[in-house]
Amino acid sequence: MIILGIDPGFEKLGCAVLKKEKTGDKLIYSTCLISKKKDPHEQRLLYLGKEIRKIIKKYKPDILSVEKLFF
């Protein structure tokens, strides 16, 4: 089973892809996506969306987990 975990953020968004195996969980990919502060909000969201789509296309996760935002 492949799991995509997302730590949401507008400026910095964390992503990790884990593979659940009988012997335990294995980290197969992680990154921090950083949008440019000078770009308009819609352009920043578009960038983050495109990058997440690339990750989904490459790793084909079975499950998505999104961390709850705390303010």
Regions found by a protein language model. Name each.
Residues 1-71:
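Phosphate- and other anionic-substrate recognition elements at nucleic-acid/protein interfaces
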